[in-house]
């Protein structure tokens, strides 16, 4: 079908998908209008993607119509085997009721499992599938939905807005501090599928929350697209941590879109651990930081095979005393390409920003590029950048091998130590799994 598909054909397919989604989700008219307006922008917007060309995009669009409401499950035991295996390895099954505030799971185009501790709901924590939040909290959603994005930015942005499906709405009431993390997992089960969850985070004054996202797919999935969009709104003194753990198989393209508006004295820490980047992974999150606000963007990147990974981050320090840090550590193997970009714009006095990029090259054919951008529009601003790209030092290997380690074990130990500082805010059960994957990758078994 994709060989003869045109943009006009794509328009008809997307129109059918919009109607199916509106019917399936019992969607209010104002949301359906947003979808149709995005479709108009899709037809004329630039693609702006170095890997996904128009033919590839049309392959995703050519997927048959969205089916009915995904069947919900009441127990973790009823989840798809791939997701259940992942949760078992992480110990989620055992700790769900005790140590985490809740868990949601989305397969393909809908949330099928959503369990959150009732005591937190009574205190003012709202966690719902996005389509349900649109119906139950229309005023809040109208105020925040797509206020940080414009459909005309690119075809992929417009496509997401037109066909978004699933995701969650996370609302934290004023003064509520959730001490345990919320977990959200995405699983792609079908090939040639575009999964487009929409996530909205609203943290009211003096609130705190930590959301952990996990992304994966069975190894046999071919040529699928994960196209998620996250909007975060942090009010005064709010603290939000967003941790994203990606482990996609090699034929999945990933295009996460994250933006956050960080209010006065608020703090947003966004950490991405990309262990399985899929065929390509391109992201350029944006943040707007208010007076004395703070944003920290951390990235741990594992490049393998012929993967193409291009991760950036743009920070606008708009309020006096605003601060931003963009830090990444990359381990690059085989013939993979990793590109890191960072841009910090100082727009107010007494702002500070720093970009750091460290990379370990484990192959002569691996490639690393870094593009820092520091822009000061005021006199009283401090902006800085540092980068270090190189191979493992022979003396480090020699020392560890002299202590009885094989070269493989020594390399694994060095690589794990290299990324360790970036994992400080991640629960230990995830850190253990991350280190296992790194060990397998370095030894050629991943």
Curated annotation (Swiss-Prot):
InterPro entries: Fe-S_cluster_assembly_SufBD, SUF_FeS_clus_asmbl_SufB, SUF_FeS_clus_asmbl_SufBD_core, SUF_FeS_clus_asmbl_SufBD_sf. Transmembrane segments: none annotated. GO terms for biological process: iron-sulfur cluster assembly. It holds the Pfam family SUFBD_core. It comes from the Archaea. Belongs to the iron-sulfur cluster assembly SufBD family. This is Iron-sulfur cluster assembly SufBD family protein PH1385.
């Amino acid at each position: 079908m994709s060989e003869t598909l045109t943009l006009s054909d794509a328009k008809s397919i997307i129109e059918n998908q919009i109607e199916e989604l509106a019917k399936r989700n019992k969607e209010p008219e104002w949301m359906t209008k947003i979808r149709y307006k995005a479709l108009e922008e899709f037809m004329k917007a630039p693609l702006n993607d170095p890997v996904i060309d128009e033919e590839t995009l049309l392959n995703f669009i050519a997927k048959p119509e969205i089916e009915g409401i995904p069947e919900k499950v009441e127990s973790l035991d009823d989840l798809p085997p791939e997701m259940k295996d992942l949760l078992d390895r992480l110990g989620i099954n055992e700790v769900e009721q005790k140590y985490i505030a809740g868990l949601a799971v989305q397969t393909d185009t809908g949330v099928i499992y959503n369990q959150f501790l009732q005591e937190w709901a009574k205190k003012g924590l709202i966690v719902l599938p996005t389509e349900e939040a649109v119906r139950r909290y229309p005023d809040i959603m109208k105020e925040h939905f797509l206020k940080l994005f414009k459909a005309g930015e690119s075809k992929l942005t417009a496509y997401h807005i037109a066909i978004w499906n699933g995701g969650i709405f996370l609302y934290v009431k004023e003064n509520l501090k959730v001490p345990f993390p919320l977990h959200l997992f995405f699983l792609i089960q079908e090939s040639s599928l575009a999964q487009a969850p929409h996530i909205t985070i609203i943290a009211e004054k003096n609130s705190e929350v930590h959301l952990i996202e996990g992304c994966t797919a069975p190894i046999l999935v071919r040529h699928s697209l994960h196209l998620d969009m996250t909007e975060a709104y942090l009010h005064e003194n709010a603290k939000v941590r967003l941790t994203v753990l990606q482990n996609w198989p090699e034929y999945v393209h990933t295009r996460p879109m994250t933006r956050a508006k960080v209010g006065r004295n608020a703090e947003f820490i966004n950490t991405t651990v990309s262990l399985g980047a899929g065929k390509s992974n391109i992201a350029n999150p944006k943040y707007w930081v208010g007076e004395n606000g703070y944003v920290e963007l951390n990235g741990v990147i594992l490049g393998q095979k012929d993967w193409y990974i291009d991760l950036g981050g743009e920070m606008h320090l708009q309020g006096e005393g605003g601060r931003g840090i963009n830090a990444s550590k990359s381990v690059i193997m085989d013939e993979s390409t990793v590109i890191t970009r960072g841009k910090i714009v100082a727009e107010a006095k007494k702002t500070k920003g720093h970009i750091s990029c460290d990379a370990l090259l484990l192959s002569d054919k691996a490639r690393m590029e870094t593009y820092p951008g520091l822009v000061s529009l005021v006199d009283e601003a401090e902006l800085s950048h540092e980068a270090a790209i190189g191979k493992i030092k022979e003396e480090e290997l020699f020392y560890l091998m002299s202590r009885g380690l094989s070269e493989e074990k020594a390399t694994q130990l060095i690589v794990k130590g290299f990324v360790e500082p970036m994992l400080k805010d991640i629960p230990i059960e995830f850190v253990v799994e991350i280190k296992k994957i790194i060990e397998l990758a370095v030894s050629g078994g991943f």
